[in-house]
């Protein structure tokens, strides 16, 4: 299939710049025929006793570092305790051996590659890399979340952006960069995140509250966790018209023996397995061999396109994705190429909000 097969027209005003007023107050589209539009807090009505919900418990780190000379680096993947791969902008300003300082801490450029990719080494004074990032870094929001002027372009004020995107989130006090940072630190993180390592949020989980999880458990819905540390490569565009020539960056995954046992038992008992997010689905499918999920830690570069044979997942909860993205290709593989194009047309007509801070949809695997 061609890259152009996965294109569709998306009005820019549907790209969510802020989260909904409450996590579970976002819209939810159930991919039935016809589709059902509801609120996320009603997801309980579409799950049943015995269902297994699998979440990604990776925690987003403050992976964006603003350095001297107007250089920004976004960490991508941990290579060792003190070394990370990263993307730099503008990379042309960097040379191997460049050093940047914050107090008694040092960030060193050790390697430089094409497409802005670099390797960095941290020489820190009695703190870990994660502690350093928590103090000096920023939440690594996607580039399509644009709340201030960039490159001389005129944009809406934060208040105007909020009101036009979602009237429910209009605030009494004026938004400021400082307040936005606090908001993102809270809302660009799932409530169940545990293991530090992601440089982008597993966004399908952002809608869940403790109350929803408690109600699901009370209903008899089982919950399990896997880990996939989301890399910056998740935002890289596909540039080849032949989609199979595209290469995905590797990402670290982990499944505990306990979780593998829970998933395999659910499969044996023919209970529904629902992946919360594409990262969870990719972790499950990467670990599955002959229908059995294997425990362990590993790296995956799995690229799921139409024709892929799914072994683990019956339903997928996910946000709305970019045109021509690897994730839109994934949902077309999961729930049907024609069906997803039709569903997205409906979502756009209903003015549902797209991408990281946007609305969610429940998809059913096409048999």
Swiss-Prot record:
Superkingdom, taxonomy of origin: Bacteria
A single Gene Ontology CC term: cytoplasm
EC number assigned by the record: 2.4.99.17
Protein's UniProt keywords contain NAD: no
Reaction(s) catalysed by this chain's protein: 7-aminomethyl-7-carbaguanosine(34) in tRNA + S-adenosyl-L-methionine = epoxyqueuosine(34) in tRNA + adenine + L-methionine + 2 H(+)
SUPFAM superfamilies, alphabetized: QueA-like
InterPro entries per record: QueA, QueA_dom1, QueA_dom2, QueA_sf
Gene Ontology terms describing biological process: queuosine biosynthetic process; tRNA wobble guanine modification
Listed pathway(s): tRNA modification; tRNA-queuosine biosynthesis
Record key words, sorted: Cytoplasm, Queuosine biosynthesis, S-adenosyl-L-methionine, Transferase
Stretches for region Disordered: 150-182
Its job: Transfers and isomerizes the ribose moiety from AdoMet to the 7-aminomethyl group of 7-deazaguanine (preQ1-tRNA) to give epoxyqueuosine (oQ-tRNA).
UniProt cross-references to PANTHER family, sorted A to Z: S-ADENOSYLMETHIONINE:TRNA RIBOSYLTRANSFERASE-ISOMERASE (PTHR30307:SF0)
Subunit structure: Monomer.
Record's protein name: S-adenosylmethionine:tRNA ribosyltransferase-isomerase
Lineage of the species this protein comes from: Bacteria, Pseudomonadati, Pseudomonadota, Alphaproteobacteria, Rickettsiales
Underlying gene: queA
């Amino acid at each position: 299939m061609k890259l152009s097969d996965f294109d569709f027209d998306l009005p820019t005003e549907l790209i969510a710049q802020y989260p909904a007023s409450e996590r579970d107050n976002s819209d939810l589209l159930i991919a039935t025929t016809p589709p059902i539009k509801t609120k996320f807090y009603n997801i309980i009505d579409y799950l049943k006793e015995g269902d297994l919900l699998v979440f990604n418990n990776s925690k987003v780190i403050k992976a964006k570092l603003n350095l001297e000379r107007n250089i920004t680096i976004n960490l991508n993947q941990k290579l060792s305790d003190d070394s990370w791969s990263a993307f730099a902008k503008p990379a042309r300003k960097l040379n191997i051996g460049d050093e940047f300082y914050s107090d008694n801490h040092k960030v060193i450029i050790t390697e430089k590659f094409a497409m802005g990719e670099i390797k960095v080494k941290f020489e820190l004074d009695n703190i870990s890399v994660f502690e350093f990032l928590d103090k000096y870094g920023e939440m690594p929001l996607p580039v399509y979340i644009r709340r201030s002027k960039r490159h001389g372009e005129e944009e809406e004020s934060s208040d105007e952006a909020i009101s036009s995107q979602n009237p429910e989130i209009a605030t009494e006090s004026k938004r400021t960069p400082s307040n936005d940072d606090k908001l993102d630190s809270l809302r660009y993180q799932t409530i169940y995140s545990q293991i530090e390592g992601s440089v982008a949020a597993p966004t399908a989980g952002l809608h869940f509250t403790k109350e929803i999880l408690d109600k699901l458990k009370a209903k008899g819905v089982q919950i399990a966790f896997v880990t996939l540390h989301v890399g910056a490569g998740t935002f890289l565009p596909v540039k080849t018209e032949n989609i199979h020539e595209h290469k995905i960056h590797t990402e670290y995954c982990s499944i505990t023996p306990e979780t593998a046992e829970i998933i395999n038992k659910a499969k044996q008992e023919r209970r529904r397995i629902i992946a919360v997010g594409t990262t969870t689905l990719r972790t499950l499918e990467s670990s599955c061999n002959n229908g059995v999920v294997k425990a362990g830690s590993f790296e995956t570069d799995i690229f799921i396109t139409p024709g892929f044979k799914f072994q683990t997942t019956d339903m997928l909860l996910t946000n709305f994705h970019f045109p021509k993205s690897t994730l839109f290709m994934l949902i077309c593989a999961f729930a049907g190429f024609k069906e997803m194009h039709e569903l997205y047309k409906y979502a756009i007509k209903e003015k549902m909000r797209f991408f990281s801070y946007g609305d969610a949809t429940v998809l059913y695997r096409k048999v």
